[in-house]
Curated annotation (Swiss-Prot):
GO cellular component terms attached to this protein's record: cytosol
Annotated compartments: Cytoplasm
Positions annotated as active site in the UniProt record: H37 (proton donor)
Domain of life: Bacteria
Binding site for (R)-pantoate: Q61, Q155
HAMAP family: PanC (MF_00158)
Pfam family, one: Pantoate_ligase
Organism listed in the record: Escherichia fergusonii (strain ATCC 35469 / DSM 13698 / CCUG 18766 / IAM 14443 / JCM 21226 / LMG 7866 / NBRC 102419 / NCTC 12128 / CDC 0568-73)
Protein name: Pantothenate synthetase
GO biological-process terms attached to the record: pantothenate biosynthetic process
Function: Catalyzes the condensation of pantoate with beta-alanine in an ATP-dependent reaction via a pantoyl-adenylate intermediate.
The keyword Transmembrane helix appears for this protein: no
UniProt keyword ATP-binding present: yes
Pathway where it operates: Cofactor biosynthesis; (R)-pantothenate biosynthesis; (R)-pantothenate from (R)-pantoate and beta-alanine: step 1/1
This protein's encoding gene: panC
Length: 283
């Protein structure tokens, strides 16, 4: 497994792979890897000849400096996990390598609408940072496919739109959420939970599933469903942050023409902001 930290060396390797006619898959990450990331790697390996995993804690997508400062950096452990998975190449650049003149004056990519709605409304600049770094990685790695987790549902929708709008010749693969046995979606942010909070955390998925059951049973008073869900979260020990029920294909509000709904939930548990989602077919 090659570990590359600079752009010239990365370009050199990508040119070699292209000359050899290899099919390349990219798995972009911020490190602190868990089994959910490994599922992305496995999906990439099944679809390509060569797998490139990027590990970069992107300062442009953090709306709070304290979140950036405390985000776990575990490069050595991450590389050991990826090596066991037989990943071909890890790209782990420094911030200086990606943003030599800082982020303030760096050219950015923005996806209108999707970047400022829902999660984007509560985290200004977050999705602009995501679309900028992902487009930069696409340009550098030139992958045939790229794998992203469905846990970050809005992010996946944003990347799909960016790829379509910008004409990237890349297949975007959404990989289903990986959960612990108790239902909690795997996330790097779960590491912020205390032992006691970890016992409470599966309640998020229980509330999410309760909303899904109501929708599948034909209930359509969305305001009431959301209000009850928020109350249930608070009673379980969470601080409900945002609950949305949207058209899964457009992320707009549910209409009579909507065929699928996505339930998007965000809640604080101690210092961890947990997100999860679930799709529901509408009768």
């Amino acid at each position: 497994m090659l570990i590359i930290e600079t752009l010239p060396l990365l370009r050199q390797q990508i040119r070699r792979l292209r000359m050899e006619g290899k099919r390349v898959a990219l798995v972009p990450t911020m490190g602190n890897l868990h089994d959910g990331h490994m599922k992305l790697v496995d999906e990439a390996k099944a679809r390509a000849d060569v797998v490139v995993v990027s590990i970069f804690v992107n300062p442009m997508q953090f709306d709070r400096p304290e979140d950036l400062a405390r985000y776990p950096r575990t490069l050595q452990e991450d590389c050991e996990k990826l090596n066991k998975r037989k990943v071909d190449l890890v790209f782990a650049p420094s911030v200086k390598e990606i943003y030599p003149n800082g982020t303030e004056t760096h050219t950015y990519v923005d996806v209108p609408g999707l970047s400022t709605m829902l999660e984007g409304a509560s985290r200004p600049g977050h999705f602009r940072g995501v679309s900028t770094i992902v487009s930069k990685l696409f340009n550098l790695v030139q992958p045939d496919i790229a794998c992203f987790g469905e846990k970050d549902f809005q992010q996946l929708a944003l990347i799909r739109k960016m790829v379509a709008d910008m004409g990237f010749d890349i297949e975007i693969v959404g990989v289903p959420i990986m959960r612990a046995k108790d239902g909690l979606a795997l996330s790097s942010r779960n590491g912020y939970l205390t032992a006691e909070q970890r016992k409470i955390a599966p309640g998020l998925y229980k509330v999410l599933s309760s909303i899904a059951d109501k929708l599948q049973a034909g209930e359509r008073d969305l305001d009431e469903i959301i209000a009850i869900a928020g109350q249930e979260l608070n009673e379980k020990g969470f601080r409900s942050d945002d609950i949305q029920i949207r058209d899964a294909d457009t992320l707009l509000e549910i209409s009579e023409n909507s065929k699928r709904a996505v339930i998007l939930v965000a809640a604080w548990l101690g210092d961890a902001r947990l997100i999860d989602n679930k799709m529901v077919e509408l009768a």
